[in-house]
């Protein structure tokens, strides 16, 4: 088999289409093209062609992963879940994850810090819910515990008081409010204490 043509892709800047025996076979980005040193006129056997096609798939997968992490921080689990849905090969998925880690685009500890900060400021999450949400994202228990213990942004008592102030008018029955707060992951004793402070006018006192 012979590489008969290498030409710039029309729709994707920086990517090149490679033709084998006169037919389109695969595409590579300019970095891959330079690294692999392939050129028009090169002869390929089946194994070499398969390897080049695998590199093509890896390059596309990596660019897609870069696009995902550029939109917002991602955990390793999120990238793996996306790769599974899109049916990437395990080998390519592992390579993509490894390269993202090497280049600092994936960091579960930083992801957890940003997640905690955003939920603390906007969502009034309980510690329990914060942990559950981070676990769903694939963050290890050690990282979760460390981030929560070191965070200056997260205070469960403040989150609980804020949520009471926000939701109290919606629940004219205190027991329903307590049940709602419990479903959000706050424990009964903390809920009772916060409600008693609110009734006595000390909800903002520390």
Residue ranges and their predicted role:
Residues 1-206:
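An alpha-helical, amphipathic repeat domain used for nucleic-acid recognition
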């Amino acid at each position: 088999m012979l590489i008969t043509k290498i030409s710039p892709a029309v729709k994707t800047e920086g990517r090149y289409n490679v033709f084998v025996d006169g037919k389109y076979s695969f595409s590579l980005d300019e970095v891959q093209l330079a690294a692999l040193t392939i050129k028009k006129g090169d002869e390929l056997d089946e194994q070499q062609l398969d390897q080049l096609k695998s590199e093509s798939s890896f390059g596309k997968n990596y660019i897609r992963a870069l696009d995902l992490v550029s939109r917002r921080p991602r955990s390793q689990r999120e990238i793996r879940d996306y790769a599974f849905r899109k049916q990437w090969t395990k080998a390519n998925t592992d390579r993509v994850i490894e390269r993202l880690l090497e280049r600092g685009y994936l960091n579960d500890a930083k992801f957890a810090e940003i997640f905690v900060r955003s939920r603390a400021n906007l969502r009034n999450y309980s510690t329990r819910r914060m942990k559950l949400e981070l676990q769903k994202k694939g963050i290890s228990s050690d990282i979760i515990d460390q981030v929560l213990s070191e965070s200056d942004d997260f205070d469960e008592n403040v989150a609980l008081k804020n949520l009471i102030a926000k939701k109290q008018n919606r629940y004219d029955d205190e027991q329903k409010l307590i049940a709602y707060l419990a479903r959000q992951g706050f424990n009964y004793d903390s809920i009772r204490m916060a409600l008693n402070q609110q009734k006595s006018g000390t909800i903002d006192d520390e």
